[in-house]
């Protein structure tokens, strides 16, 4: 198959004041530690689930088949049935829409589906499809069974989206020729193809577009044992000696996200090479991740800043999103799409009709006294 593409460790015994005092020393040490290939990388971006420059091109780490794909068991079962049925009928797959937080493998699943079907895989993003001619350029060259993958599909311009409706439903491309009263529509037949869309904001899709997908599937956060398998697989592919305990230490701090797990693994690998003998043990992994202020629950200094501001300035909440963004200096969309999903997942933050509220579990993790059940992944 061809692919064509357009702060502090957060120890529970420490309070917020002590963690703040360690910040400058941490930043100095991170700057001085030269990591192979990524000198000057921003350590605060380690836990952001969005792809960093160059990461999306690392095809060697991507699974090629459903059998190689780790995790998402229910999704794989649904897709294996769809693939078998399409093969039996000798038909292309129905259109598919994948949604969920970033970094969970939506692009990878799309590429795996194309490989399983023996199809050509065309990949683009909605922001790159600014005008109808952009999407038309893809549609007219698709052959029967080819897969067109559109990432961030919720960001499609309206005129481009409307061009997709007849293409998805009737496999035709409606082109308007001329302007004003002399304008006319010419329809071009298209080969039967499969459109796969990916989005982190399924609620932002219009109903007409969403309803044209035959499969709408959600990708969930990964369990720690699944991330351990992913880390060990990456270690084998990169030929890095790694203990299962070292892989587990990385996995439990990876926020349920494979992209973050692989990113943290590479930083731990660099640390082991510079500060040790190249072998990743539990002790080496913990020391490396503590250097980057990724604590045992997978929180970094920005996560802790968000929670601490809610506690110290607003008594734990409730606080509206815009207010929280103004006080912390973070973009509201970044808070909502990057940081909140994981904090909600582990039970450290709650959304209420009146705003965001810090939970007792988060208070205890930050070093404040609180009586509550243990967090979900403790």
Curated annotation (Swiss-Prot):
The keyword Disulfide bond does not apply. Keywords: ATP-binding, Cytoplasm, DNA damage, DNA recombination, DNA repair, DNA-binding, Hydrolase, Nucleotide-binding. ATP binds at residues 61-62, 103, 106-108, 169-171, 212, 222, 259. The RuvA-RuvB-RuvC complex processes Holliday junction (HJ) DNA during genetic recombination and DNA repair, while the RuvA-RuvB complex plays an important role in the rescue of blocked DNA replication forks via replication fork reversal (RFR). RuvA specifically binds to HJ cruciform DNA, conferring on it an open structure. The RuvB hexamer acts as an ATP-dependent pump, pulling dsDNA into and through the RuvAB complex. RuvB forms 2 homohexamers on either side of HJ DNA bound by 1 or 2 RuvA tetramers; 4 subunits per hexamer contact DNA at a time. Residues 13-222 are annotated as: Large ATPase domain (RuvB-L). Its EC number is 3.6.4.-. This is Holliday junction branch migration complex subunit RuvB. DNA binds at residues 351, 356. Belongs to the RuvB family. Residues 296-378 are annotated as: Head domain (RuvB-H). It comes from the Bacteria. It comes from Synechococcus sp. (strain JA-2-3B'a(2-13)). GO terms for cellular component: cytoplasm; Holliday junction resolvase complex. It is found in: Cytoplasm.
């Amino acid at each position: 198959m061809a692919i064509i593409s357009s702060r502090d460790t957060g120890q529970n015994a420490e309070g917020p004041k002590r963690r703040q005092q360690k910040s400058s020393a941490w930043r100095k040490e991170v700057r001085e530690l030269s990591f192979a290939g990524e000198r000057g990388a921003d350590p605060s971006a380690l836990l952001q689930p969005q792809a960093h420059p160059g990461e999306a091109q690392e095809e060697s780490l991507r699974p090629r088949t459903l059998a190689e794909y780790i995790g998402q068991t229910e999704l794989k079962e649904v897709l294996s049935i769809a693939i078998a049925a399409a093969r039996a009928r000798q038909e292309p797959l129905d259109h598919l829409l994948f949604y969920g937080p970033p970094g969970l493998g939506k692009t990878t699943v799309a590429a795996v589906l194309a490989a399983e079907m023996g199809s050509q895989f065309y990949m683009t993003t909605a922001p790159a499809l600014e005008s109808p001619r952009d999407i038309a350029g893809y549609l007219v060259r698709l052959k029967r069974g080819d897969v067109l993958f559109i990432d961030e599909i919720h960001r499609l311009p309206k005129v481009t989206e409307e061009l997709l409706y007849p293409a998805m439903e009737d496999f035709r491309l409606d082109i308007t020729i001329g302007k004003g009263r002399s304008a006319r529509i010419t329809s071009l037949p298209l080969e039967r193809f499969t459109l796969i869309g990916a989005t982190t904001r399924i609620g932002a899709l219009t109903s007409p577009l969403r309803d044209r997908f035959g499969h709408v599937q959600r990708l969930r956060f990964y369990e720690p044992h699944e991330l351990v398998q992913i880390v060990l697989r990456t270690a084998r592919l990169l030929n890095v000696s790694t203990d299962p305990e070292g892989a587990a230490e990385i996995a439990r701090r990876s926020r349920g996200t494979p992209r973050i797990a692989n990113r943290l693994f590479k930083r731990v690998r660099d640390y082991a090479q510079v500060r040790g003998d190249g072998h990743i043990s539990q002790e080496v992994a913990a020391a490396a991740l503590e250097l980057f202020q990724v604590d045992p629950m997978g929180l970094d200094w920005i996560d802790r800043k968000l929670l601490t501001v809610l506690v110290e300035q607003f008594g734990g909440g409730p606080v509206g999103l815009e207010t929280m963004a103004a006080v912390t200096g973070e973009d509201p969309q970044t808070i909502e799409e990057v940081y909140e999903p994981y904090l909600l997942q582990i039970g450290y933050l709650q959304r209420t009709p009146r705003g965001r509220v810090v939970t007792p579990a988060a208070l205890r993790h930050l070093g404040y006294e609180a009586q509550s059940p243990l967090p979900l992944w403790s």
